[in-house]
């Protein structure tokens, strides 16, 4: 069975972000907190967002989602206040269509 042609596939977007936290947080707890925030804000329809934490180094990271859900994911990311019991302030750095461009433009120092 053949896959979908590129013109029919869902487009992905990559959101670069920075987390200011009182203590170090790990990738798993951040991913869980973001999923829980999406679920509480938008209900079960967040499953169609294609949400995935691509990279996180303790302070900066990249979240992948489908283009149609970009606004919802950015809202959920912005409204997060706690991750695993640690108070956080998430800052969105920018959005890109590829991981490579996202890293080069927003995450390199």
UniProtKB/Swiss-Prot annotation:
The keyword Flavoprotein does not apply. Its main location: cytoplasm. One of its GO terms (biological process) is tRNA 5'-leader removal. InterPro entries: Pop5/Rpp14/Rnp2-like, Rnp2-like_sf, Rnp2_archaea. HAMAP family: RNase_P_2 (MF_00755). Gene3D superfamilies: Ribonuclease P, Pop5 subunit. It is an enzyme of class 3 (hydrolase). Keywords: Cytoplasm, Endonuclease, Hydrolase, Nuclease, tRNA processing. The keyword Hydrolase applies. It is found in: Cytoplasm. It comes from Archaeoglobus fulgidus (strain ATCC 49558 / DSM 4304 / JCM 9628 / NBRC 100126 / VC-16). GO terms for molecular function: ribonuclease P activity. GO terms for cellular component: cytoplasm; ribonuclease P complex. Part of ribonuclease P, a protein complex that generates mature tRNA molecules by cleaving their 5'-ends. Its EC number is 3.1.26.5. It catalyses: Endonucleolytic cleavage of RNA, removing 5'-extranucleotides from tRNA precursor. This is Ribonuclease P protein component 2. Consists of a catalytic RNA component and at least 4-5 protein subunits. Belongs to the eukaryotic/archaeal RNase P protein component 2 family.
